[in-house]
Amino acid sequence: MIVNVIGAGLAGSEVTYNLGKRGIRVRLFEMRPKKMTEVHKTGYFAELVCSNSLKSEDITNAEGLLKAEMRLMGSITLEAAEKARVPSGKALAVDRNIFAKEVTEAVESLESVEIIREEVTEFDPEEGIWVVATGPATSDGLLPFLKKLLGDDFLFFFDAVSPIVTFESIDMERAFWGDRFGKGKDYINCPLTKEEYEEFWKALVEAEVIEMEDFDRKLLFERCQPIEEIARSGKDALRYGPLRPTGLVDPRTGKEPYAVIQLRREDKEGRFYSLVGFQTRLKWSEQKRVLRKIPCLRNAEIVRYGVMHRNVYINSPKLLDIFFRLKKHPNIFFAGQITGVEGYMESAASGIYVAYNVHRILKGLSPLKLPEETMMGALFSYIIEKVEGDLKPMYANFGLLPPLKVRVKDKFEKRKKLAERAIETMKKFLEENPW
């Protein structure tokens, strides 16, 4: 039987690769580059559109634990990330183009995978196995069919992307290198005095934004909230948020600045840097004007402006079973951010999970739920079984895991024990239920 996968993002690529490398015939549909979305720039698979950071690898961090579990199950996302890694302190950050190219070439190399560069606008829900992994930027051509298939259980939130500037246009006479509390030198820090901060804040809150159809401030998801929305919540909101100076000492003064804008490397050569936490929906002309208020970026060359787009996801608790299958059509699976998991790694992890169970079904076995002691199992259980009311996008966090049997007061030690339990549980699960 052929497995049809719609969408070659992180989740779709994981589904395709994990099935294809095991000899399962897969037909992968990807409309790019023939038809582009409003946020993608290339035709590569697994293109990262929000940030180039895949976050922490430390297992005492929820994102790091998630990665550890994904490696145990097998992840093309993490294999490609290792080859595309750029310096980013304790975080795993990648060169976007190298990363996407690595994933694309890995999928294309599989003999059992057929790649069709066409937009899917409909399919027969009664025939074959389908995996819908079209992501938050699902095409307008497919949406009407999905709405007809699913009913009115579509939700959405708004997402925003940060600007990118060239390294050579940054005033390094005023900027300084460093991570918080002296842990490395991977970030460029642009310090602001009180007067400079207030001038920047005033320009930001007064700047014109791009209005969007159906825009509602309450729909802005907190992890990608536009910087101008944060600024409007209070004059010091940025100083306690993305511009907080904590742990960053300016070597010129020997003190923490009043506020700091951090820039993170975007490519291996270090030619481009993105503004950390600067997701925005400002008009492009306003972005240029506002960034000029930052002394280190007074002459910055912006190579990608921040943009904002609407993300689509489905009401998974109502529509899907725990294996991410449609309750009405169990031959149709959903994977990735369209299910309500939030984040790059969470999206990729859901693709691995779907591939694992599709593989079991094709072998004549029953699908399996991952143990809730694992981060993957806890996240997927929350999305499908534990949400009350309408689903809100959810990312990996330790609050999802069942408590330890013995109370541990120290926060770090508690997370360490939760992580160790999760990894051991996943290892045992895979030993008993291998691919």
From Swiss-Prot:
InterPro entries: FAD/NAD-bd_sf (IPR036188), MnmG-rel (IPR002218), MnmG_N (IPR040131), TrmFO (IPR004417). Its cofactor is FAD. It is an enzyme of class 2 (transferase). It catalyses: uridine(54) in tRNA + (6R)-5,10-methylene-5,6,7,8-tetrahydrofolate + NADH + H(+) = 5-methyluridine(54) in tRNA + (6S)-5,6,7,8-tetrahydrofolate + NAD(+); uridine(54) in tRNA + (6R)-5,10-methylene-5,6,7,8-tetrahydrofolate + NADPH + H(+) = 5-methyluridine(54) in tRNA + (6S)-5,6,7,8-tetrahydrofolate + NADP(+). Keywords: Cytoplasm, FAD, Flavoprotein, Methyltransferase, NAD, NADP, Transferase, tRNA processing. GO terms for biological process: tRNA methylation; tRNA wobble uridine modification. Its main location: cytoplasm. GO terms for molecular function: flavin adenine dinucleotide binding; tRNA (uracil(54)-C5)-methyltransferase activity, 5,10-methylenetetrahydrofolate-dependent. Its EC number is 2.1.1.74. It is found in: Cytoplasm. Pfam families: GIDA. FAD binds at residues 7-12. One of its GO terms (cellular component) is cytosol. SUPFAM superfamilies: FAD/NAD(P)-binding domain. Belongs to the MnmG family. TrmFO subfamily. Catalyzes the folate-dependent formation of 5-methyl-uridine at position 54 (M-5-U54) in all tRNAs. HAMAP family: TrmFO (MF_01037). This is Methylenetetrahydrofolate--tRNA-(uracil-5-)-methyltransferase TrmFO. It comes from Thermotoga sp. (strain RQ2). The gene is trmFO.
